A protein has these predicted regions:
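Hydrophobic N-terminal alpha-helices or hydrophobic patches in metabolic proteins across all domains
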Residues: 224-227, 255, 279, 605
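Generic hydrophobic, helix-prone segments enriched in Leu/Val/Ile
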Residues: 188, 550, 554, 577-584, ...
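Active-site segments that bind and position negatively charged phosphate/pyrophosphate groups
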Residues: 591-619
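A transmembrane helix-and-boundary motif of multi-pass membrane transporters/channels
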Residues: 1-246, 250, 358-601, 682
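Soluble C-terminal extramembrane regulatory/interaction domains of multi-pass membrane proteins
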Residues: 198-216, 255-374, 611-689
C-alpha cells in the first residue's frame, strides 16, 4: 500500500525506507568524522584538565590538528607530529641554554631554526614534511610562552618545554585512541586496489598492443603519459597505508619499489611502442607476435582479462608466472637487434610488475610473501632551490616580526610571531598554492574568532561542569567536522581546517576561565596581524612558479644526462633511477603529458648509456661509443644518431663468444637512438655552446 506520492506516482513504504537508508549511508561517514573530531578534542581536554596542566587547550588543539578523514593519515600524522614536537622542544631548550642573557642572539637563532625547518619541510615529503614544519613552530610556541614583553629567555624554559610537549603529545595520543577505536581503516585496501588497477590496465593495454596488427597499432602515448600521472598520485596514499599498519611500515621499501616498478614498466612499454612504430608492417607484426607467444598462456589469460581482482586474488602465484616469463624473454633466441630490443624491453615491463606483485602480496597479507627489501629506493632531492627560497623567506619573515615586536614592546605581539611561524612553515612546501592558502587560512581564522567569541562569552559563563563544556564544544566541532568531510572544494577545506585548528586556541579553556574581552581581542589582533604578514611574505618573496619548476626539472635532468654521457666515473643504475624517480614524483600537477614523457625518456636513455658503456669496456669498443656519446653531451642529436649507427656496425662485426653480448648492446643502441629521435628538441635544449 502506498502512503506517500512522488512526482512520478505513489511511493511504497519499502521504497521510502530504501531512500532514507541511502541518504543515511551518504551522510554517515562525514557525521562520524565530526563525532570523532569532537570526541578526540573532548578526551584530550579531559586528560589535560585532570593532570592540571597550565594550558590544556594545546592538547585539544593538537587533537583537532591530528584528526583526518582517513585513519592511516591521522595515525601517520600523529606519529610524525610527536617526533616534531620533541625535536622542537629540545631545540628551544638548547637555544635558551646557549644564550640565557642575550635576547638578540636568542631571537635571531630562533628565526634561523625556523628557516632550517622550512628547508627540511620542503625537502621531505608528506607527513615527514609536516614533522619538520612542526619542529619549527613548536619551538616558536614554547618561546612565546617563555619570553617577556620584549623578548629574553627564562630559566624555566625546560619545565615549560616539557609541559607544552606533554600537552601536545596528550592531544596526539587521544586523537589516535578515538580514531583507532572508531575506524577500522581502509588505506591499505585502497592502496592495494590502486596498485592492482594500475597494473591490470597497464599490462592489459600492453598485451592488446602486441596482439594488434601493425595497421591497427594504436597511439599509446597519451595513455602512457596519463599512467605516469596516476603513478605519481600513489605517493600520499602509500604514506597513509604506512600509518595504519606496523607490518606494512616495516616493509615500506617494498611499497616504494612497487611504485617504481610501475615507472619501469611504463618505460619498457615506451621502448616497445616506439620501436614497433618505426618498423615496417611485416616486421612489426612478426616481432610483436613472437613476444606475445613467448608469454605463458596462463599469464596471457590474466593480462587479457584486464581485471584488478585477479591481481589481488593470488599475487604470489602471478609473481611466479611473471618471473618465468621474464627469464624466457631474456633468454629468447634473437638474430636481430630489433627482436632483442623487443624481448628485453618486454622483460623490463614484466620485471617492473614483479615489484608491483611483491607490494600487492604485502598489502593483501598473502602467505609466504617475500622478505622486506632493506635497500629499497633512496630518493634524492630533485631541486634544492625551492627549499633554499623557503628557508630564506621563513628567516626574513619571522625575523622581521621579532624586530617589530621588540621595537614596539607589544605585550601580545608574541602571538603574531607564532602565527607567522605556523603559516610560513606549513604552507611553504605548497609552492604556488602557499599565497592563496595563507589568505584562505586568514579567512578561516576570522571565522574561528567569531565562533570562539560566541561560545566563550555567550555560552561558557553559564556552564560550570566539564560535560557542559563538551556540549558547548559540540555546537562548533560537529558541524565543522561534518562540513570538512563533505567538502570537495580545497578552498572550503582549508578555511574549515583553519577554523577547527584555531578555535581551541581562541577559546582557551582552562581550569579557571578568563572572560576578559579586552584581552581576548588583543590576542585576536595579534593573530590577525600574523595572518596578514604571511600572505605579505609570500607575495614579496614568492615561491617558484610551477612552470618554472617544471622547466628546471627538465633542464637539470638534461644536464645530468649530458654529464652522464661523458662521466669518467659512472653512477650505479640504481642511483640514476632514484634521481629521476624523485623528479617524476616532485613534478607539479601542471606538467603536460609531453613533459612527463620527456623525463621518462631521459630515465631510459641514462640507464641504457650506463649499461652500454659498461658493455663497451668489456668488448673493447669504448672509442666508437665515446664519439657518439660526446655528441649527446653537446646536444647534437642528429650527429649522435649517425655515430650510434656506426657504433652499431662495429658491434655487428663482433665475433663469438661476445656476439650475444654485442647483440644486446645493439638493442640498447636502438633504444637510445629512437628516444633521442622522438625527443630530439628536448635533448638538444640547454646544451653547452
Amino acid at each position: 500500500m502506498a502512503d506517500t506520492f512522488g512526482q512520478s506516482g505513489p511511493i511504497s513504504e519499502a521504497d521510502a525506507i530504501g531512500r532514507w537508508s541511502l541518504a543515511f549511508a551518504k551522510v554517515a561517514p562525514p557525521l562520524l568524522f565530526g563525532l570523532r573530531l569532537w570526541a578526540a578534542v573532548c578526551l584530550a581536554l579531559f586528560v589535560a584538565f585532570w593532570l592540571e596542566l597550565d594550558n590544556p587547550f594545546w592538547a585539544g588543539t593538537s587533537a583537532a590538528i591530528v584528526c583526518q578523514a582517513q585513519l592511516g593519515a591521522s595515525l601517520r600524522k600523529g606519529w610524525f607530529r610527536m617526533i616534531g614536537t620533541v625535536v622542537g622542544a629540545t631545540m628551544i631548550v638548547v637555544l635558551t641554554a646557549c644564550f640565557p642573557q642575550d635576547r638578540i642572539a636568542f631571537l635571531a637563532l630562533l628565526a634561523v631554526w625556523c628557516g632550517l625547518c622550512a628547508f627540511a619541510a620542503t625537502v621531505f615529503r608528506n607527513f615527514a614534511s609536516y614533522s619538520a614544519a612542526l619542529a619549527g613552530y613548536t619551538a616558536a610556541i614554547i618561546a612565546a610562552d617563555n619570553l617577556g614583553a620584549t623578548g629574553g629567555a627564562s630559566s624555566d624554559v625546560f619545565l615549560l618545554a616539557v609541559t607544552r610537549a606533554s600537552e601536545i603529545c596528550i592531544g596526539i595520543a587521544c586523537a589516535g585512541i578515538v580514531l583507532a577505536g572508531t575506524d577500522l581503516g581502509g588505506a591499505q585496501r585502497r592502496l592495494a586496489e590502486s596498485f592492482a588497477s594500475l597494473a591490470a590496465e597497464i599490462m592489459g593495454q600492453f598485451v592488446r598492443m602486441l596482439g594488434l596488427p601493425e595497421a591497427q597499432l594504436p597511439d599509446t602515448k597519451a595513455g602512457r603519459r596519463e599512467f605516469v600521472r596516476r603513478v605519481i598520485a600513489l605517493d600520499p596514499v602509500i604514506d597513509q597505508a604506512l600509518g595504519e599498519s606496523s607490518h606494512v611500515r616495516y616493509h615500506s621499501p617494498n611499497l616504494q619499489t612497487a611504485m617504481y616498478g610501475l615507472f619501469a614498466a611504463l618505460d619498457g612499454w615506451r621502448g616497445v611502442a616506439t620501436h614497433l612504430g618505426r618498423l615496417s608492417e611485416a616486421a612489426g607484426r612478426q616481432g610483436a607476435h613472437i613476444i606475445l607467444q613467448s608469454l605463458p598462456a596462463e599469464l596471457r589469460s590474466v593480462l587479457e582479462a584486464d581485471s584488478p581482482l585477479l591481481w589481488i586474488a593470488d599475487p604470489l602465484a602471478l609473481h611466479r608466472v611473471c618471473k618465468q616469463a621474464v627469464h624466457t624473454l631474456i633468454a629468447l633466441p634473437a638474430d636481430t637487434p630489433s627482436l632483442r630490443l623487443l624481448a628485453d624491453e618486454a622483460a623490463k615491463v614484466l620485471a617492473g610488475m614483479l615489484h608491483v606483485l611483491d607490494g600487492l602480496a604485502l598489502l593483501v597479507d598473502a602467505p609466504g610473501q617475500p622478505s622486506p627489501d632493506t635497500r629499497g629506493f633512496r630518493l634524492g632531492e630533485p631541486d634544492w632551490l625551492p627549499a633554499l627560497i623557503n628557508a630564506a623567506r621563513a628567516f626574513l619573515a619571522i625575523g622581521a616580526v621579532e624586530l617589530f615586536w621588540v621595537a614596539t614592546a607589544w605585550p601580545t605581539g608574541v602571538a603574531a610571531i607564532v602565527i607567522v611561524a605556523i603559516l610560513i612553515l606549513l604552507l611553504s612546501p605548497k609552492g604556488d598554492l602557499a599565497y592563496g592558502g595563507s589568505l584562505v587560512f586568514a579567512l578561516g581564522t576570522a571565522g574561528a574568532v567569531i565562533c570562539a567569541a560566541a561560545v566563550k562569552f555567550a555560552m561558557l559563563p553559564a556552564l560550570q561542569t566539564f560535560p557542559a563544556l563538551c556540549a558547548a564544544l559540540a555546537v562548533f566541532f560537529l558541524p565543522a567536522g561534518f562540513a570538512m568531510a563533505v567538502s570537495r572544494q580545497p578552498v572550503a577545506t582549508v578555511a574549515l581546517t583553519a577554523m577547527t585548528v584555531n578555535f581551541n586556541v581562541l577559546l582557551a579553556p582552562i581550569n579557571e576561565m578568563n572572560y576578559d574581552t579586552a584581552q581576548y581581542y588583543n590576542s585576536v589582533l595579534a593573530i590577525m596581524v600574523g595572518c596578514s604578514v604571511a600572505p605579505l611574505a609570500f607575495s614579496l618573496f614568492p615561491p617558484l612558479s610551477p612552470a618554472f619548476r617544471i622547466r628546471r626539472f627538465l633542464a637539470l635532468t638534461s644536464r645530468d644526462l649530458r654529464r652522464l654521457a661523458v662521466a669518467a666515473l659512472l653512477p650505479a643504475p640504481h642511483d640514476w633511477e632514484s634521481r629521476i624517480y624523485s623528479r617524476l614524483i616532485a613534478l607539479p600537477d601542471q606538467a603536460t603529458p609531453l613533459q612527463r614523457a620527456q623525463l621518462l625518456a631521459a630515465l631510459s636513455v641514462g640507464a641504457e648509456i650506463i649499461g652500454l658503456r659498461q658493455m663497451a669496456t668489456q668488448l673493447g669498443t669504448t672509442a666508437e661509443l665515446d664519439a657518439a656519446l660526446n655528441d649527446v653531451a653537446l646536444g647534437h642529436s642528429s650527429n649522435a644518431i649517425a655515430k650510434l649507427r656506426q657504433f652499431d656496425d662495429r658491434l655487428a662485426a663482433t665475433p663469438e663468444p661476445e656476439a650475444t653480448m654485442a647483440l644486446r648492446g645493439r638493442g640498447r643502441v636502438l633504444i637510445i637512438s629512437e628516444a633521442i629521435a622522438e625527443h630530439g628538441h628536448y635533448f638538444d635544449t640547454g646544451a653547452p655552446a
